[in-house]
């Protein structure tokens, strides 16, 4: 459709990467990309293949690229009153917090170990995870 012009000539392409709250909390707060010194910007981590596909679809070089975002939420000064340093340290905010580690890694219907979700629990341990190994992995010093 693009190549034969049946939908006209594309002038711009807007692409959005929607990362679920529990996915973001795992990958960019607790997970492999939690440290900007050791990882890549989110646009490279989440969108490099998207950009390849867009380049192929457009059959043209990109002239402008914009990415928006900053560390504005997961900071110590934004923590709720009564929050512990770590979720598993008896956090007073556990029940109302959507980012609670036990919810994300054990009970969340999309990501929880107890629901059979697989990822992200299966990347926290070297061996196939058990509840004990997941709790141990989540308690590794910051």
Where do the language-model regions lie?
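Glycine-enriched catalytic-core subsegment of oxygenase/oxidase enzymes
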Residues: 138-142
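Predominantly a Rossmann-like dinucleotide-binding segment in NAD(P)-dependent oxidoreductases
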Residues: 1-137
